[in-house]
Amino acid sequence: MRFRNPVAIAFLLAWLPVNPGLAASAVVKDGSTIQLGNVTYRLDGIDAPAVDQPCIDEHADPWACGVEARDQLTKLIGGKPIHCDDIGIDPTAKKRRLGVCKIEGDPTSLSQVLVRQGYALNVEASATGRFKPDEAAAKNDRLGLWKGCFVAPSEFRSSKKDGALLGNSCPADRDTQIRAALFPDDLAMPASCNIKGKYAVRARVTGNVGIYHLQACRSYPGLTNPDRWFCSEEDAQAAGFRRAYNCRPGAKSK
């Protein structure tokens, strides 16, 4: 069978995944997520702060570590072509894939480099996880996140406020103050990430953890203390949030 409709062919090509055997330019979405063509990959074996996650630096000052983690990955890639070995659907976000991604010509994965630089955590449960030595070295050298105080990215995303404090600058006698800084009531909005997210029990009816609000939603102005900020609807959906029902039909994030 031969396709003669150029519009149909273009539509099909737009939804085909990038050939895993080819290298392509990457768009960095956060410290452990990149997009190649129309395919979004979470880097396998690691986790990094979401763009809106705050940390505390070595001087006990608030630190936008999620933004820095994203920028560090952008700097690491440096516009060079990226090759990803696709290893399947991301179990935490069905529209995304897991990938072992490398700069073309470099045998070391982006995952390993980010863990060694201290901007991502090893998440493999095994004590002999691939990146355990890299994480131990980063912690010992006070690199990246480890120079300050932070919570595991997964615990920030789930709002687990009583989780373990990580890093080399977490004095035990300041526990309450540190947690207040890591889970602030007034979470700062990262630049160009103006989608508001709010955890909501009613969202569980649809299998979600919260609701996101675009600027075109009637609820947007009245939501003054969002729990999360997202840069795109895809990011919000990957985090388990659904769109508010009071958004205008056809509304899009700006």
Q: Where are the regions a protein language model picked out?
A:
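Bacterial N-terminal signal peptides that target proteins for export
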Residues: 1-8
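Bacterial N-terminal signal peptides
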Residues: 8-18
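Short, surface-exposed secondary-structure junctions/capping segments
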Residues: 54-65, 124-143
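Mature, structured domains enriched in cysteine- and short glycine motifs
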Residues: 121-129, 144-254
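Electropositive
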Residues: 22-119
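N-terminal leader and targeting sequences that precede the mature domain
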Residues: 41-47, 82, 108, 129-145, ...
